[in-house]
Amino acid sequence: MMNFNNVFRWHLPFLFLVLLTFRAAAADTLLILGDSLSAGYRMSASAAWPALLNDKWQSKTSVVNASISGDTSQQGLARLPALLKQHQPRWVLVELGGNDGLRGFQPQQTEQTLRQILQDVKAANAEPLLMQIRLPANYGRRYNEAFSAIYPKLAKEFDVPLLPFFMEEVYLKPQWMQDDGIHPNRDAQPFIADWMAKQLQPLVNHDS
Protein backbone atom coordinates (compact mmCIF):
# COMPACT_ATOMS: atom_id res chain seq x y z
CA MET A 1 0.00 0.00 0.00
CA MET A 2 1.31 3.45 -0.89
CA ASN A 3 2.35 5.48 2.08
CA PHE A 4 -0.13 8.33 2.76
CA ASN A 5 2.65 10.80 3.46
CA ASN A 6 4.22 10.08 0.08
CA VAL A 7 0.88 10.58 -1.67
CA PHE A 8 0.36 13.85 0.18
CA ARG A 9 3.83 15.09 -0.72
CA TRP A 10 3.27 14.18 -4.37
CA HIS A 11 -0.03 16.04 -4.54
CA LEU A 12 0.99 19.03 -2.43
CA PRO A 13 2.37 21.15 -5.31
CA PHE A 14 -0.77 20.48 -7.34
CA LEU A 15 -3.05 21.37 -4.42
CA PHE A 16 -1.06 24.54 -3.81
CA LEU A 17 -1.46 25.55 -7.46
CA VAL A 18 -5.20 24.89 -7.33
CA LEU A 19 -5.47 26.99 -4.18
CA LEU A 20 -3.60 29.88 -5.77
CA THR A 21 -5.80 29.69 -8.86
CA PHE A 22 -8.93 29.67 -6.74
CA ARG A 23 -7.76 32.62 -4.67
CA ALA A 24 -6.84 34.57 -7.80
CA ALA A 25 -10.26 33.92 -9.29
CA ALA A 26 -12.01 34.84 -6.05
CA ALA A 27 -9.94 38.02 -5.74
CA ASP A 28 -11.15 39.61 -8.99
CA THR A 29 -12.67 42.85 -7.75
CA LEU A 30 -13.91 45.87 -9.66
CA LEU A 31 -13.61 48.98 -7.50
CA ILE A 32 -15.79 51.90 -8.56
CA LEU A 33 -14.33 55.24 -7.52
CA GLY A 34 -17.05 57.72 -8.32
CA ASP A 35 -19.40 60.44 -7.17
CA SER A 36 -23.19 60.74 -6.86
CA LEU A 37 -23.80 59.33 -10.34
CA SER A 38 -22.55 55.98 -9.06
CA ALA A 39 -23.26 56.34 -5.34
CA GLY A 40 -27.02 56.26 -5.80
CA TYR A 41 -28.03 59.83 -5.00
CA ARG A 42 -31.27 59.99 -2.97
CA MET A 43 -31.65 56.21 -2.95
CA SER A 44 -30.31 53.25 -1.04
CA ALA A 45 -26.95 51.88 -2.12
CA SER A 46 -28.62 48.55 -2.90
CA ALA A 47 -30.77 50.26 -5.56
CA ALA A 48 -27.84 51.95 -7.33
CA TRP A 49 -26.44 50.53 -10.55
CA PRO A 50 -23.16 49.20 -9.04
CA ALA A 51 -25.13 46.96 -6.65
CA LEU A 52 -27.33 45.78 -9.52
CA LEU A 53 -24.23 45.08 -11.59
CA ASN A 54 -22.79 43.06 -8.71
CA ASP A 55 -26.01 41.03 -8.56
CA LYS A 56 -25.92 40.52 -12.32
CA TRP A 57 -22.34 39.28 -12.30
CA GLN A 58 -22.90 37.14 -9.19
CA SER A 59 -19.61 35.41 -8.37
CA LYS A 60 -17.77 36.30 -11.60
CA THR A 61 -16.46 39.60 -10.24
CA SER A 62 -17.06 41.37 -6.97
CA VAL A 63 -18.16 44.97 -7.49
CA VAL A 64 -17.14 47.30 -4.67
CA ASN A 65 -18.83 50.67 -4.86
CA ALA A 66 -16.60 53.27 -3.21
CA SER A 67 -18.48 56.22 -4.70
CA ILE A 68 -19.47 59.17 -2.51
CA SER A 69 -21.95 61.85 -3.49
CA GLY A 70 -20.31 65.23 -3.90
CA ASP A 71 -16.78 63.89 -4.23
CA THR A 72 -14.37 65.86 -6.36
CA SER A 73 -11.45 64.18 -8.07
CA GLN A 74 -9.18 65.45 -5.28
CA GLN A 75 -11.35 63.84 -2.62
CA GLY A 76 -11.37 60.61 -4.58
CA LEU A 77 -7.59 60.72 -4.81
CA ALA A 78 -7.33 61.20 -1.05
CA ARG A 79 -9.46 58.10 -0.40
CA LEU A 80 -7.78 55.92 -3.02
CA PRO A 81 -4.72 54.56 -1.13
CA ALA A 82 -6.83 53.09 1.68
CA LEU A 83 -9.30 51.62 -0.82
CA LEU A 84 -6.53 49.98 -2.84
CA LYS A 85 -5.02 48.51 0.30
CA GLN A 86 -8.34 47.25 1.65
CA HIS A 87 -9.85 45.75 -1.50
CA GLN A 88 -6.79 44.98 -3.66
CA PRO A 89 -8.89 45.31 -6.84
CA ARG A 90 -7.99 43.96 -10.23
CA TRP A 91 -9.78 46.87 -11.94
CA VAL A 92 -10.62 50.41 -10.82
CA LEU A 93 -13.33 52.30 -12.67
CA VAL A 94 -12.72 56.04 -12.25
CA GLU A 95 -15.96 58.02 -12.55
CA LEU A 96 -14.85 61.39 -11.22
CA GLY A 97 -14.53 64.98 -12.31
CA GLY A 98 -18.16 65.98 -12.63
CA ASN A 99 -18.17 67.89 -9.35
CA ASP A 100 -14.92 69.58 -10.34
CA GLY A 101 -16.64 70.90 -13.43
CA LEU A 102 -19.85 71.89 -11.66
CA ARG A 103 -17.75 73.92 -9.22
CA GLY A 104 -15.79 75.58 -11.99
CA PHE A 105 -12.38 74.07 -11.21
CA GLN A 106 -9.70 74.70 -13.79
CA PRO A 107 -9.58 71.75 -16.23
CA GLN A 108 -5.81 71.56 -15.80
CA GLN A 109 -6.30 70.98 -12.07
CA THR A 110 -8.77 68.16 -12.66
CA GLU A 111 -6.52 66.65 -15.31
CA GLN A 112 -3.55 66.54 -12.96
CA THR A 113 -5.60 64.95 -10.18
CA LEU A 114 -7.02 62.29 -12.48
CA ARG A 115 -3.51 61.65 -13.78
CA GLN A 116 -2.34 60.98 -10.23
CA ILE A 117 -5.29 58.64 -9.66
CA LEU A 118 -4.38 56.61 -12.73
CA GLN A 119 -0.74 56.51 -11.67
CA ASP A 120 -1.68 55.29 -8.19
CA VAL A 121 -3.97 52.59 -9.57
CA LYS A 122 -1.25 51.30 -11.88
CA ALA A 123 1.32 51.42 -9.08
CA ALA A 124 -0.98 49.09 -7.11
CA ASN A 125 -0.90 46.61 -10.03
CA ALA A 126 -4.56 47.24 -10.79
CA GLU A 127 -6.02 48.09 -14.18
CA PRO A 128 -7.58 51.58 -14.46
CA LEU A 129 -10.76 52.11 -16.46
CA LEU A 130 -11.63 55.74 -17.12
CA MET A 131 -15.13 57.05 -17.75
CA GLN A 132 -15.71 60.08 -19.92
CA ILE A 133 -17.51 62.84 -18.02
CA ARG A 134 -19.45 65.64 -19.68
CA LEU A 135 -20.99 68.79 -18.23
CA PRO A 136 -24.31 70.51 -18.93
CA ALA A 137 -24.24 72.77 -21.98
CA ASN A 138 -24.86 75.90 -19.90
CA TYR A 139 -21.27 75.84 -18.64
CA GLY A 140 -20.15 77.32 -21.94
CA ARG A 141 -18.58 75.82 -25.02
CA ARG A 142 -14.97 76.74 -24.26
CA TYR A 143 -15.03 75.35 -20.72
CA ASN A 144 -16.97 72.25 -21.78
CA GLU A 145 -14.56 71.47 -24.60
CA ALA A 146 -11.51 71.89 -22.37
CA PHE A 147 -13.09 69.74 -19.68
CA SER A 148 -14.27 66.96 -21.99
CA ALA A 149 -10.84 66.77 -23.64
CA ILE A 150 -9.22 65.70 -20.35
CA TYR A 151 -10.51 62.15 -20.57
CA PRO A 152 -9.42 60.99 -24.04
CA LYS A 153 -6.07 62.69 -23.43
CA LEU A 154 -5.45 60.71 -20.25
CA ALA A 155 -6.80 57.48 -21.73
CA LYS A 156 -4.27 57.80 -24.55
CA GLU A 157 -1.46 58.84 -22.22
CA PHE A 158 -1.94 55.82 -19.95
CA ASP A 159 -3.20 53.44 -22.64
CA VAL A 160 -6.35 52.65 -20.66
CA PRO A 161 -9.94 52.06 -21.82
CA LEU A 162 -12.18 55.12 -22.04
CA LEU A 163 -15.79 54.24 -21.31
CA PRO A 164 -18.61 56.37 -22.72
CA PHE A 165 -20.56 58.57 -20.30
CA PHE A 166 -23.65 56.55 -19.36
CA MET A 167 -25.62 59.69 -18.56
CA GLU A 168 -25.75 60.56 -22.26
CA GLU A 169 -28.07 57.57 -22.64
CA VAL A 170 -30.11 58.44 -19.56
CA TYR A 171 -30.65 62.06 -20.62
CA LEU A 172 -32.67 60.76 -23.58
CA LYS A 173 -35.34 59.53 -21.16
CA PRO A 174 -36.65 62.46 -19.06
CA GLN A 175 -38.61 60.01 -16.91
CA TRP A 176 -35.29 58.57 -15.73
CA MET A 177 -34.05 61.89 -14.34
CA GLN A 178 -34.48 63.35 -10.87
CA ASP A 179 -35.99 66.80 -10.47
CA ASP A 180 -32.56 68.44 -10.34
CA GLY A 181 -31.92 67.49 -13.97
CA ILE A 182 -28.48 66.11 -13.06
CA HIS A 183 -28.95 62.75 -11.34
CA PRO A 184 -30.57 59.56 -12.61
CA ASN A 185 -33.48 58.29 -10.55
CA ARG A 186 -34.14 54.80 -9.25
CA ASP A 187 -35.97 53.75 -12.42
CA ALA A 188 -32.82 54.41 -14.47
CA GLN A 189 -30.56 52.16 -12.41
CA PRO A 190 -31.41 48.79 -14.05
CA PHE A 191 -30.76 50.28 -17.48
CA ILE A 192 -27.43 51.75 -16.35
CA ALA A 193 -26.39 48.42 -14.83
CA ASP A 194 -27.18 46.55 -18.06
CA TRP A 195 -25.50 49.22 -20.19
CA MET A 196 -22.39 49.22 -18.01
CA ALA A 197 -22.26 45.42 -18.10
CA LYS A 198 -22.09 45.58 -21.91
CA GLN A 199 -19.35 48.21 -21.79
CA LEU A 200 -17.30 46.34 -19.19
CA GLN A 201 -17.82 42.80 -20.49
CA PRO A 202 -14.93 42.79 -22.98
CA LEU A 203 -12.66 44.42 -20.40
CA VAL A 204 -13.28 41.90 -17.62
CA ASN A 205 -13.75 38.87 -19.89
CA HIS A 206 -17.37 38.18 -19.02
CA ASP A 207 -20.05 36.59 -21.17
CA SER A 208 -22.65 38.99 -19.80
From Swiss-Prot:
Protease is stable up to 50 degrees Celsius. GO terms for molecular function: arylesterase activity; fatty acyl-[ACP] hydrolase activity; identical protein binding; long-chain fatty acyl-CoA hydrolase activity; lysophospholipase activity; peptidase activity. Coiled coil: none annotated. Thioesterase activity is inhibited by iodoacetamide and photoactivated methylene blue, and slowly inhibited by 2,4-dinitrofluorobenzene. Protease and lysophospholipase activities are inhibited by diisopropylfluorophosphate (DFP). Lysophospholipase activity is inhibited by Fe(2+), Fe(3+) and Al(3+) ions. Diethyl p-nitrophenyl phosphate (DENP) irreversibly inhibits both the protease and thioesterase activities. SUPFAM superfamilies: SGNH hydrolase. Disruption phenotype: Cells lacking this gene do not show thioesterase activity and have a little protease activity against Cbz-Phe-ONap. No effect on the cell growth and fatty acid composition. Changing G70A: Retains weak hydrolysis activity. Its main location: periplasm. The active site is at S36 (nucleophile), D180, H183. It catalyses: a fatty acyl-CoA + H2O = a fatty acid + CoA + H(+); hexadecanoyl-CoA + H2O = hexadecanoate + CoA + H(+); (9Z)-hexadecenoyl-CoA + H2O = (9Z)-hexadecenoate + CoA + H(+); octadecanoyl-CoA + H2O = octadecanoate + CoA + H(+). CDD domains: Lysophospholipase_L1_like. One of its GO terms (biological process) is proteolysis. Its EC number is 3.1.2.2, 3.1.1.2, 3.1.1.5, 3.1.2.14. InterPro entries: Ester_Hydrolysis_Enzymes (IPR051532), Lipase_GDSL_AS (IPR008265), SGNH_hydro (IPR013830), SGNH_hydro_sf (IPR036514). Optimum pH is 7.5-8.4. Stable between pH 6.1 and 12, however, below pH 6.0, thioesterase rapidly loses activity. It is an enzyme of class 3 (hydrolase). TesA is a multifunctional esterase that can act as a thioesterase, lysophospholipase and protease. TesA functions as a thioesterase specific for fatty acyl thioesters of greater than ten carbons, with highest activity on palmitoyl-CoA, cis-vaccenoyl-CoA and palmitoleoyl-CoA. TesA also possesses an arylesterase activity towards short acyl-chain aromatic esters such as alpha-naphthyl acetate, alpha-naphthyl butyrate, benzyl acetate and phenyl acetate. Belongs to the 'GDSL' lipolytic enzyme family. Monomer or homotetramer. This is Thioesterase 1/protease 1/lysophospholipase L1. The gene is tesA.
